[in-house]
Amino acid sequence: MDTLSPFAVDRRLGGRVRTWLSAAVCAVSAGVCAVVSGAAWAGAQVEEPLADSVRTALSAAIGRTEPVLVFADAAQRQQCEGWAVSLEAKLLKRKPEELVRREFLQTVCYEAKRAGLEPGLVLGLIQVESGFRKYAISSVGARGYMQIMPFWSRTIGNGDPASLFHMQTNIRFGCVILRHYLDVERGNLFMALGRYNGSRGRAEYPNMVTAAWRGWKL
C-alpha cells in the first residue's frame, strides 16, 4: 500500500509540510517576493512566478499525483469519520450516493487538516467555486471541486491537468494553494480568499465563502 498519504507525509518529513510553506514564504518576503470557481465565479487568477523555495515547498506538500487516503492512526480516522457522518445529511441532495458522499467528506476533512485549514471552510469554498461538481470547468479553465487552474499542475504537480479531476488530487491542490495564500497574506483570510479567486481586495467572493462556511459549522 502506498504510504505517501497526507498524514504519512507529515510523519516522514518530521511534521514539516505546513512549516515548509510558511518558512518558504517568509524567506521570499525577505528578498524579492515573486509570488476559481463555478461558472458564476470564474476568477481571473493570474499565474505568478514562484521563488524556488516556495515552488519546492508546494511540490513537497502536493506529493504524488493521486494520493491514497491512509490515516496515521485510529484517532485521526475516527475524527474525520465522525465529522463526515455529522454532515452527511446536509450533502444528501448534492451527493445522493452514500459511499461517494462519505468518501468526499472524509477526504475534505483529511486534506484540510493536513494543510492546517478548517474542513468547513474548505466545504464553503467548494460550494461557491463548483457547487460540489467534480468535473466543473470554469470559463477560464479552472477545474474540479476547488477550481484549480491548470498551470498549477505544471508548476507544482505532474504536468497533467487531467489529474485535477481526481477527487483527492483536486482537494489536495486546493488546500495546499489556499494554505500558501494564507501564508503569503500573513493569515488574513479575506485577502487569501480573494487571491485564490483572482479578486484580491474585493469583498464579494470572500463574503460568499465565509457565509457558505457558516452553513457547514456543526
Task: Kindly give the residue locations of the regions a language model identified.
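N-terminal secretory targeting signals
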Residues: 1-89, 93-99, 214-218
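Catalytic glycan-binding domains that act on GlcNAc-containing polysaccharides
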Residues: 59, 66-218
